[in-house]
């Protein structure tokens, strides 16, 4: 991509892939539900201390579809961009990175949040993912 993310992203987002050394990132898709459900379910106790309260239906397919709709609305409004993180080699979904509160103009800024499945933590995968997203953005 010739321009940086914070300059312009538009309709190019849907097919986007960001490469790191150990991971690659792309926007979430409906077909990611099983992998997302598995890693989030397996990591629930690990993630709960760091995240807002989990509603009782948070891991359902319907909830995942609502999440994807919210992500699409954020992209349409140029307000936020979400990525799933996949491990190189086996393609396992290991976490997610979210860019939110996107501000255009002079400041060209955003906030970043992330989550990592417990079985993939402390291996440098999220560090690699964050570095790849930062390089992509700026």
Predicted regions and their residues:
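GNAT-family acyltransferases
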Residues: 1-119
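Conserved acetyl-CoA-binding loop-helix of GNAT-fold acetyltransferases
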Residues: 115, 122-136
């Amino acid at each position: 991509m010739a321009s940086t993310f914070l300059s312009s992203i538009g309709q190019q987002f849907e097919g986007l892939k960001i490469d790191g050394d150990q991971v690659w990132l792309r926007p979430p898709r409906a077909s990611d539900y099983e992998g997302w459900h598995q890693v989030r379910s397996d990591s629930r106790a690990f993630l709960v201390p760091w995240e807002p309260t989990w509603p009782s239906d948070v891991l359902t397919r319907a909830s995942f579809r609502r999440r994807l709709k919210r992500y699409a609305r954020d992209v349409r409004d140029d307000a936020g961009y979400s990525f799933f993180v996949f491990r190189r080699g086996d393609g396992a979904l290991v976490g997610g990175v979210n860019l939110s509160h996107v501000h255009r103009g002079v400041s060209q800024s955003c906030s970043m949040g992330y989550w990592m499945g417990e079985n993939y933590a402390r291996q440098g995968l999220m560090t690699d993912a964050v570095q790849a997203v930062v390089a992509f953005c700026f």
